[in-house]
Amino acid sequence: MATQTVEDSSRARPRQTSVGSLLKPLNSEYGKVAPGWGTTPLMGIAMALFAIFLSIILEIYNSSILLDGISMN
């Protein structure tokens, strides 16, 4: 068969590094959700501004906005 069983004793354990020890407290909140809406409205505003930016770029690309002093080929 293509499946291979690995015994627990033969597995290599992950090394503990100083960077890992420094970053471990930052990962302690993993999976926890803050109550309420949190930063959802801020993310919605950022998405709306990004959509407006993309539509402006698309309109310039399609030459549907004429800019004074800039010649388009």
Curated annotation (Swiss-Prot):
Principal subcellular localisation of the protein: plastid
Coiled-coil intervals: none
Xref: Gene3D superfamilies: Photosystem II reaction center protein H
Location in the cell: Plastid, Chloroplast thylakoid membrane
Any single Gene Ontology cellular-component annotation: photosystem II
Pfam families: PsbH (PF00737)
Topological type in the membrane: Single-pass membrane protein
A biological process from GO: protein stabilization
Post-translational modifications reported in the UniProt record: Phosphorylation is a light-dependent reaction catalyzed by a membrane-bound kinase; phosphorylation occurs on Thr residue(s) in the N-terminus of the protein.
Sites bearing Phosphothreonine, chain numbering: T3, T5
Record keywords: Chloroplast, Membrane, Phosphoprotein, Photosynthesis, Photosystem II, Plastid, Thylakoid, Transmembrane, Transmembrane helix
Annotated SUPFAM superfamilies: Photosystem II 10 kDa phosphoprotein PsbH
Region (Disordered): 1-20
Subunit structure: PSII is composed of 1 copy each of membrane proteins PsbA, PsbB, PsbC, PsbD, PsbE, PsbF, PsbH, PsbI, PsbJ, PsbK, PsbL, PsbM, PsbT, PsbX, PsbY, PsbZ, Psb30/Ycf12, at least 3 peripheral proteins of the oxygen-evolving complex and a large number of cofactors. It forms dimeric complexes.
Function per UniProt: One of the components of the core complex of photosystem II (PSII), required for its stability and/or assembly. PSII is a light-driven water:plastoquinone oxidoreductase that uses light energy to abstract electrons from H(2)O, generating O(2) and a proton gradient subsequently used for ATP formation. It consists of a core antenna complex that captures photons, and an electron transfer chain that converts photonic excitation into a charge separation.
Family: Belongs to the PsbH family.
Alphabetized HAMAP family for the sequence: PSII_PsbH
Record protein name field: Photosystem II reaction center protein H
Species of provenance: Lotus japonicus
